[in-house]
Amino acid sequence: MNRRCFTLVAASLMALSSQAQQVDFNIASRKAAEVTALNFTPVGVKQGNTYQFALGGLEITLDAPVKDQIIKSNWFKQGIQLGDRLTSDGIVVYPSKGDNAQLRITIRGLKPGHHSLLAYHNIVDGLTGNIPSIQVSREKEQITTMKKGKKRIQQKSMMQEILAQDIKQTVREMKASQSGQSYIEFDVTDDQPVVIHYQLQGVDNANNTLTINGLVFDKANPKATALNPYPADDDLHVNAEGGKVVLRWQAGEGAKQHLIYIGQRADQLKKVATTEEAAFEATSLSS
C-alpha cells in the first residue's frame, strides 16, 4: 500500500524530471548525509572568493566579482535538525560594510536549447529589519555598428540582460516551498559558458548579504506546480488502512485542474482521475 501512494506523490505531483540537475549548497564542516536534501547533489563550499565543482556534465564556477567580498557556507542548525535540509543552509556572500553583495555563477556544458534555473534564497543568519531583494541578470554579447568615414565598424561588448528582479529573500523559513526563490529562463545557442549574476538591489541595506541555498536546472517553476504533498516525498510508512488514503497537496498558482496518476513505478503510472480539488482519495491500494 505504501509504495503506490508514495510513487504518485513523488513522481506525479512533484514532477521531478530525470534530466534535472539539482545542487544543495551545504555547510562545509558537516557530513553530507546530515545536511543534504533528498534527490539533491551535495556541495560543501569552503570560504574564499571562488569555488568550482562538477554537476553531472556541467562545470560550475562560483565567484564574488567585487573586491574584498567573500563566499562562505553557513547554516541554521535548528532548521536542519527539524528536517529542512535544503533551505536551512547554503552559501552566503559577505561584502565589505556599505557594499551590496554580488555572486557570479559561470556554467559550462549546457546543451544548446532552452533552459531554466531555479535558486533558493533563504537567509540562515538571524537577521531582522530591512532585508534586501535580489536582481538576476545574464551576461550577453552586444554588437554595436559604428560608421567611420565610409566604413562601418562592428564593436562587441558585454551587457547585463536583467532576467528577474525584486526577488525577496526570506529569513529562516523552514519550508522550501515558502522560501525566497528566483526562477529564470534563457537560451543557449552554442558551447559558450552561461554567466549569471545575482546581486542585491539598493545601496542602503544594513543587512547586505546574499544567500543561495540550492540550484535546480531545467525543472518546472515550483510556483506553477503542486507542492507540499501528503504523504510527503519518500514517506513509505503512510497509513493506508483498508487500502485507502486521502492524498493532499498545495495547488500551483492558477491551477484549475489536477491530473492524478497512480502506479508502483515512476515510469509506469496510470491516469486514474481529474479533480478540481487539491485532494483525492486513492482506493484499492495493495502492497
Residue ranges and their predicted role:
Residues 112, 252-256:
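Short proline/glycine-enriched turn/loop motifs at strand-loop junctions of beta-rich domains
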Residues 222-253:
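Pro/Thr/Ser/Gly-rich low-complexity, intrinsically disordered linker/stalk tracts
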Residues 1-7:
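Bacterial N-terminal signal peptides that target proteins for export
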Residues 11-19:
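Hydrophobic h-region of N-terminal signal peptides that target proteins for export
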Residues 111-112, 240-241, 286-287:
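Surface-exposed loops/turns
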